[in-house]
Amino acid sequence: MTASYQPQLVFVDGSFAELAQDMASVLQISDEIQPLLDSEKESEALTKIVSESKKLNAIPEKEFTGAYNLLVHLVLQSKEPKKHLPTICQNLTRPVTSSPQHGAQLALFELTSIFNLLKPNDPVRFNVFIQIIRFYKIHSIPISDHLKSALKQLPRWLQSWELDEEDQRKMYSEVIEVMTAAGEEEEAYQHILKALRTFDSEDAEDYTSEEAQQLALRALRSAISSPTRLSFEDIRALPAVHALSESHPVHYQLLQIFGEQDLDDYDDFREEHEGFIEKENLDNEVLYRKMRLLTFASLAAASMQTREISYNSITKALQIPSEDVEMWAIDVIRAGLVEGKLSQKKKVFLIHSVRYRVFGEKQWRQLASSLEKTKKTVSTLLQTLRREEANAQQEAERKLVEASTQHNNDRGNQRRGGNRGQQHRERNDNDD
């Protein structure tokens, strides 16, 4: 947008005085507004109109949108829209008494319109968007795809509004609360991580603050308790989360188990810290299932050299009966941790590929070894192809020589045959 950008509502036309008087009529305060307009006290007139604007929530439903459009237009065309918009937004979060059925949607539409009418880099958008987020929670509105789409742009918006880290966390906190209340756990989790990234990674005092540690704990609990979250590299990479190893060592130990250890380690943890899982309101059944899937993945990663795991190894590591191996193999494949198939005949799981839980020095060595094997295989294949190509070329050349020789021989025979015929005719002529 250019600096000359001016917001404009459709179907709103007229001078300030004319439009202000129209608004005053709707609010039934014309007697108070007209003297101010006559005295050219437009700012005072607008302040009075905005202060009375809560009455718009009680006007007939069919007039609601038009009236609010007019009010918003007056405010946006004024010298101080920032002064008046908070009041309007606050009014819109209140119930629309004239329309119990459609009031929430009408008000949300108006809030969204205000946001869209502001310049993209206008910091006032920050407060309007917070009101939109809160509106969803206040009125228990299901999270729309439109809002989810808007949230993808939120980091860019926050940057364009030039907000400090505290205000950025304020916004993310609002989103987290709304998403949590709506049962959108994954959305909430992702915004917890975004909030944690606003802490200065080079300032220990910042990322070890009480606020940072509480957010880190919330992220940890969310990551561990989620039935579908099977990757923990994103959360473990955050300094605020790593700092939990000092401030909340038991929590951090549990995260480490889910990040890179196995079911036996989880059992040892529960024995060592009896009652901790229950105290944290974590579902042990969900956690146990996750650890079995993660243990299967670790087993597959450790078996990449042979590319197979015996049924016995699976039953022992997962602590399951042999008849359940197929079920867990299917589950780990569906979870995207491992690709492979069962061999009922050999009683093994054949590994095609595996998603490493941790990619460290050991995994780099394994990758280097695998690449070296691939390199040797490709080199051998190229040598074979070149050898076969050379043999084919030699064979083609040999056949070409043979064909040329045969052609020359045939021509020679034809010439010799022609000479003998001519000599025979000459003898016959001489005989005569």
UniProtKB/Swiss-Prot annotation:
Gene Ontology CC: eukaryotic 43S preinitiation complex; eukaryotic 48S preinitiation complex; eukaryotic translation initiation factor 3 complex, eIF3m
- Chief place of localization: cytoplasm
Question: SMART domains annotated for this entry?
Answer: PINT
- Recall the GO molecular function terms of this protein's record: translation initiation factor activity
Instruction: Domain (PCI): give its ranges.
Output: 184-356
Which SUPFAM superfamilies does the UniProt entry name for this protein?
A: ARM repeat (SSF48371)
Region (Disordered) residue spans: 392-432
For this UniProt record, the keywords arranged alphabetically read as follows: Cytoplasm, Initiation factor, Protein biosynthesis
Organism domain of life = Eukaryota
Look up the record and give one Gene Ontology term from the biological process aspect: formation of cytoplasmic translation initiation complex
InterPro entries attached to this UniProt entry = ARM-type_fold, COPS7/eIF3m, eIF3m, PCI_dom
Q: Where in the cell is it found?
A: Cytoplasm
Please describe what this protein does. Answer: Component of the eukaryotic translation initiation factor 3 (eIF-3) complex, which is involved in protein synthesis of a specialized repertoire of mRNAs and, together with other initiation factors, stimulates binding of mRNA and methionyl-tRNAi to the 40S ribosome. The eIF-3 complex specifically targets and initiates translation of a subset of mRNAs involved in cell proliferation.
Family named by the database record: Belongs to the eIF-3 subunit M family.
**Protein name per UniProt:** Eukaryotic translation initiation factor 3 subunit M
Species of origin = Pyricularia oryzae (strain 70-15 / ATCC MYA-4617 / FGSC 8958) (Rice blast fungus)
Q: What is the lineage of its organism?
A: Eukaryota, Fungi, Dikarya, Ascomycota, Pezizomycotina
